């Protein structure tokens, strides 16, 4: 089941973002029955650009990721992974995006594990009931964790008009595979 929660936050100060994120988790309800110590949690962020920092509002803001890492590691005792495949099709873009957005520093400071989906093993997914896309690949980590927390960046998009939670999951498709399913 998919549950969505939204909370207003007027800036990216860590304390305010953490409060807003905790409010979202409380809106989901009974989070303690879903998340247990030792679970593997993937924060599926949105890294569209390897050249634009947090101030450009293109990628998931690093403070949001920091707040989530602190909550899932600190409050729930989970093993936290941070993963994506950058929107750019250039080799090395995802690693660069983790650096430019300072996600690599967050992982280093907190012990979270960065997963570059372009370098992750890929799993073949088949859905014979699908009308159009019956087969595609996703990063293995997406299926191997206990919980995937989708952390999109709501913004406009040239092909789909806007991008959000559903579109963000396209980043689970490694490397050039994304262009085939757009």
Regions found by a protein language model. Name each.
Residues 1-182:
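N-terminal and secondary-structure boundary signal
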């Amino acid at each position: 089941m998919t549950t969505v929660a939204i909370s207003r936050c007027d800036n990216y100060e860590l304390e305010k973002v953490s409060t807003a994120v905790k409010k979202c988790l409380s809106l989901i309800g009974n989070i303690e029955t879903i998340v247990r110590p030792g679970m593997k949690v993937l924060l599926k962020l949105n890294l569209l650009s390897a050249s634009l920092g947090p101030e450009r509002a293109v990628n998931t803001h690093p403070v949001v990721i920091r707040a989530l890492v602190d909550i899932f590691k600190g409050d729930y005792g989970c093993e936290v992974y941070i993963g994506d495949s950058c929107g750019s099709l250039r080799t090395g873009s995802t690693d660069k995006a983790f650096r430019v957005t300072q996600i690599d520093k967050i992982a280093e400071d907190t012990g979270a594990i960065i997963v570059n989906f372009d370098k992750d093993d890929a799993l073949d997914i088949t859905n014979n009931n699908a009308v159009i896309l019956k087969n595609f690949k996703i990063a293995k980590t997406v299926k191997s964790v206990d919980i995937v927390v989708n952390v999109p960046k709501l913004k406009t998009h040239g092909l789909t008009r806007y991008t959000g939670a559903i579109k963000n999951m396209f980043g689970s498709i490694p490397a050039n595979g994304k262009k085939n399913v757009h």
